[in-house]
Regions:
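Non-catalytic terminal extensions that flank enzyme cores
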Residues: 1-47
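M16 family metallopeptidases and their MPP-like homologs
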Residues: 45-55, 81-129, 136-147, 174-199, ...
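Generic recognition of flexible, low-complexity loop/linker segments
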Residues: 94, 210-214, 271-274, 317, ...
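Active-site His/Glu-centered metal-binding helix of metallohydrolases
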Residues: 62, 66-70, 574
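Hydrophobic, small-residue-rich alpha-helical packing segments that form membrane-like cores
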Residues: 150-152, 156-221, 225-240, 247-273, ...
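His/Glu-based metal-binding/catalytic segments typifying zinc-dependent metallopeptidases
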Residues: 40-42, 49-51, 162, 166-170, ...
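Non-catalytic, conformational "gating/processing" segments within enzyme and secreted inhibitor domains
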Residues: 208-242, 715-749
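Extended, domain-scale alpha-helical bundle/helix-rich regions
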Residues: 434-475
Length: 958
């Protein structure tokens, strides 16, 4: 490393971190007081983050709104939305901003040095010199504002964060966690909702926003993170241009520990659908503060204990409550912050039995603590945790960004930055604790002996939505009636100013101020994992040739294409049932412990592939392990696949009920997922398959099954028979990543018998209507329009560029910026499916019109001669993914199942590089033709149903 004490920075500390193969440099910017950490690692992906301590003083969501707003133009970049411009034209591998409970972080990453410097510069200018400080319209757009309709003489509220949080508060899980934190940490920042409570967001004023920014967004309160191979001197020089404008001052202090308190049970209501029965739908959340950020051993210990107590239906605490019919599901997890909380969540209970449940949990944990915990179970779970920690596989999340998010969890409070990344010593200490009573002592922290605990009882109310809608309407009428003429004129003027700012065309100078890339900056080659196809013992082998650091990943894919419709739900249920039933040699808990003790993972799931419009579904049984443990892998795969005894109807009922509840929660909190599957289920087989495996069709079937013991018994028998039917060598394809020998694979193949006859494929019939409204207890909407076109496959490069144009320009401006929705987008899939979608949308009727008009926008853009290079660059960047060994295995397998190759990807890339503006007319034709005979699905509450054209619409009540 060359001398890095340049550009106003001085080195405080240098340390080699062998555990992550990095050298850490801790620096300080002398003049401004900014802190900086650089991890010098062999990673071509360069990561940056800047974070600020932002403890909230109220529930207005001020720091969440600032997080959104600073990215809406700055002193150097005079655009309304540089963030959206970066999404259009950057090669970024990560671009986001995140509000935590006491900090706000702005992370970016890119493999391209030029792009990386551009991103850093835009973000630094955004956080320190945002246009927010001089333009109240930015606050009105991203936070909240009044809207007055003179025709109806009504007043309403709108705003991106306001609508985002209305969606969040529609989720029972989020509402419960927010309420629990308020009870545990009353009177502190951690008892406030940093995201913003929709009831309190309107209390926030523009002056309050400016004051909060001035206080918290100063370099002395900033911590900067860098990671990867980069020209560090250039980065430090760039940072100095922003930091040197400031003089050092005292940073914002984060409050110390909250005084321990035992809070009384807090009772709140949560909304369920009007059609739902309230009986047995209450939820209980218990919270126990057990340590602070300095005690990292306790976090690992609590992860171990949570898994032992509640990791599966066979775990002792969860099994006890299920067997006594006191709940339908249960979870236990840690919520980590300055102080760490163990949360026990008990779902679908009788509200009158809450005290009984609390007492039973307390007694059970005390008994386990006094009798001692089986050391082999602790050791097995620790092995599993250690495997994941050493694997350090974050999926598509860049490693540097994952490190940044981890580091801020302790660094923000004054801990050494590296503390959060290093685990060897911590694991050794935790293992040492097994010799004594460490784990038993930790258990006592989740009993009534804990002096810092709280409980929340959530009562279902199927009238709450209508009641709150009526109250909100009355409240807005009252506010309007109380306004003077001058106040109303001010509201109208603010809205007019907002619309004028939103619709103003950026100047040429403003557009040219934003740093851009050219097509020459795009890497000429792509690195996409591709499976090599071999045949072994009559079975197809998919080998993914990437380095795995001694880990072997194997997936066994059993073709289930001779099943369709309702039968596919049984495949999905089977994947959930495996590992929850006894086998020839093990109880469920013993099998799980064997897997944890010897493997990295052992799992069952479902997979699908689509070739030329024909869908193939699979039961997937997989495992990962060190090369030295592959004998155990073979042994446990055999045990799971061939000897599982699925014959316990009570356990099948538990699983069916839990899956039903999970789907119900998903339909409320992630309504766009449901809307997309419903819209596509009326158009293509893939949509129908998705519905039966995990959508509304699955939910509807499970509701019917769970109401009848006879149907549960039939389901149990069907699933048991299905396992025997599917685990057949004729159906098998094996995906392998890592140094697995043919001998090992032959051994796996030999496990499975080979039946006779051909596997006759069945087609799954379409299962949705062309125009649907799914009624859920949600205060915001999710609106989708889908269509099909066989021209997409031959124009995939064009449609990928159009996705960028529509998602980050047209839809962003019309649905997010003007409409106030939290999210929106357009997607075109290789099978020909096209979809528009909105997310946490206050006006789905308007969004549907925007979708229809998109083709006119594309034709107009095609005739304008506008340079669309930035959209090409952004589109290519989206598909140049970062690959870890586990991700490589998944991607290469998925590509094969879908008939996609590295050559296909390279061809599409070449097509994208040659797209011109005039080609957009062709895209408009494809979209116009598809959606003219397409389908519409909207998921929301009653108030939005009233705003839609109901002609020909099917209304589904959840």
């Amino acid at each position: 490393m060359t001398n890095i004490e340049k550009h106003g920075f001085s080195v405080i500390r240098e340390q080699r971190l062998d555990e992550i193969d990095a050298t850490m440099y801790e620096l300080c910017h002398t003049k401004s007081g900014a802190s900086l950490v650089y991890l010098e690692r062999e990673d071509e992906n360069k990561s940056f983050a800047i974070g600020f301590a932002t403890p909230p003083e109220d529930d207005t969501g001020v720091f969440h709104i600032i997080e959104h707003s600073v990215l809406c133009g700055s002193e150097k970049y005079q655009l309304n939305d540089p963030f959206a411009e970066l999404l259009k034209g950057s090669l970024n591998t990560f671009l986001n901003a995140i509000t935590y409970e006491d900090r706000t972080i702005y992370p970016v990453s890119s493999r391209c040095e030029k792009d990386f410097l551009n991103l850093v510069d835009v973000y630094m200018d955004a956080v320190f010199a945002p246009n927010l400080l001089k333009n109240p319209s930015i606050f009105h757009q991203e936070g909240w504002h009044y809207e007055y309709d003179p025709e109806s003489d009504t007043l309403s509220r709108n705003g991106v964060v306001y609508n985002e949080m209305k969606g969040a508060y529609s989720s029972a899980d989020e509402l419960g966690m927010i309420t629990l934190n308020r009870a545990l940490f009353e009177g502190t920042a951690y008892g406030k909702d940093s995201g913003g409570d929709p009831a309190y967001i309107p209390n926030l004023t523009y002056d309050m926003v400016k004051a909060a920014h001035e206080k918290h967004y100063h370099p002395s309160n900033a911590r900067i993170f860098l990671d990867g191979i980069m020209d560090l001197e250039s980065v430090l020089e760039l940072l100095d241009t922003h930091l040197s404008k400031y003089d050092r001052r005292e940073p914002v202090s984060l409050a110390g520990k909250c005084a321990p308190r035992v809070a009384p049970i807090k009772r709140i209501s949560y909304e369920i659908a009007e059609s739902e029965d309230e009986k047995g739908r209450a939820r209980l959340m218990l919270g126990y503060v057990y340590s602070d950020y300095t005690d990292r051993e306790s976090n690992i210990a609590m992860s171990v204990l949570s898994d032992i107590l509640c990791g599966s239906n066979a775990s002792p605490l969860k099994k006890l409550l299920l067997d006594k019919n006191l709940c339908k599901d249960m979870a236990m997890y840690s919520s980590k912050s300055r102080e760490n909380t163990l949360v026990i969540e008990v779902r679908d209970i009788d509200e009158n039995k809450a005290d009984e449940i609390i007492n039973l949990i307390d007694d059970t944990i005390r008994t386990m603590a006094s009798e001692g915990i089986d050391k082999s179970k602790i050791n097995a779970t620790l092995n599993s945790i250690e495997f994941r920690l050493r694997e350090r596989d974050f999926g598509t999340l860049p490693t540097g960004i994952a490190f940044a998010m981890t580091i801020y969890g302790g660094w923000i409070y004054g801990a050494n930055p590296e503390d959060s990344l290093l685990y060897n010593d911590i694991l050794a200490k935790v293992r040492e604790g097994m010799r004594g009573s460490y784990f038993e002592d930790m258990l006592m922290k989740i009993t009534r002996d804990n002096p810092h605990r709280a409980a929340v009882l959530m009562i279902p109310d199927n009238k709450l939505g209508a009641k709150e809608a009526t109250e909100d309407k009355a409240r807005m009428a009252e506010i309007l009636a109380g306004m003077s003429k001058e106040e109303l004129a001010s509201v109208v003027a603010d809205e007019e100013a907002l619309r004028a700012w939103q619709q103003a065309e950026p100047t040429k100078e403003a557009m040219e101020s934003l740093p851009t890339l050219s097509l020459d900056d795009i890497p000429k080659t792509i690195s996409r994992p591709c499976a090599k196809v071999e045949m072994l013992c009559g079975v197809k082998i998919l080998r993914c040739p990437v380095k795995t650091n001694g880990i072997v990943y194997i997936s066994l894919l059993f073709d289930t294409s001779d099943l369709s419709g309702e039968e596919l739900l049984r495949v999905s249920m089977l994947s959930s049932a495996l590992l929850n039933f006894p086998t020839e040699s093990y109880s469920p808990l013993e099998l799980q412990n064997e897997a944890k003790a010897n493997l990295g993972s052992l799992f069952a799931s479902i997979a699908t592939g689509s070739r030329d419009g024909v869908i193939t579904t699979y039961l997937k049984i997989g495992a990962s392990a060190l090369l030295s443990k592959t004998d155990d892998m073979v042994r446990l795969i055999r045990e799971l696949a061939l000897t599982s005894r699925i014959d316990d109807t009570a356990e099948i009922k538990n699983l069916a009920t839990q899956i039903k509840t999970h789907l119900e929660d998903m339909m409320i909190s992630s309504g766009e997922t449901l809307a997309l599957s419903r819209a596509q289920a009326s158009l293509n087989e893939e949509g129908a398959v998705t519905e039966y495996m995990g959508g509304y069709e699955a939910y509807k079937l499970l509701c019917d099954i769970c109401d009848s013991d006879e149907r549960i018994a039939a389901l149990t028998a069907d699933i048991s028979a299905l396992l025997k039917k599917l685990t057949d060598r004729r159906r098998l394809t094996i995906s392998v990543t890592g140094d697995a020998s043919d001998e090992l694979l032959s051994e796996i193949i030999s496990i499975f018998p080979s039946g006779e006859g051909d596997i006759i494929k069945k087609r799954t019939a379409l299962c949705a209507d062309k125009k649907e409204f799914v009624l859920t207890p949600s205060k915001v909407a999710y609106a989708v329009v889908s269509g099909m076109s066989d021209r997409v496959k031959d124009n995939l490069g064009l449609m990928r560029v159009v996705r960028s144009i529509l998602s980050y320009e047209y839809l962003w401006n019309n649905i997010r910026v003007l409409g106030g929705a939290y999210g929106c987008g357009f997607v075109a899939k290789r099978d020909g499916a096209l979809s528009f979608y909105s997310y946490r949308d206050p006006n789905p009727a308007a969004s549907l019109k925007v979708y229809t008009a998109s083709v006119d926008y594309l034709r107009e853009l095609a005739g304008s001669g506008e340079d669309i290079t930035k959209f090409i660059i952004g589109s290519i960047g989206e598909h140049d993914m970062l690959i870890t060994p586990r991700t490589a295995s998944l991607v290469s397998t998925t590509d094969y199942l879908n008939g996609w190759s590295a050559e296909d990807e390279a061809r599409v890339r070449r097509e994208m590089l040659g797209i011109k503006a005039e080609d957009l007319c062709r895209a408009a034709e494809i979209i116009d033709s598809a959606i003219s005979c397409g389908s519409t699905a909207v998921v929301s509450g009653q108030e939005h149903l009233a705003t839609l054209d109901r002609d020909g619409m099917t209304v589904i009540k959840i």
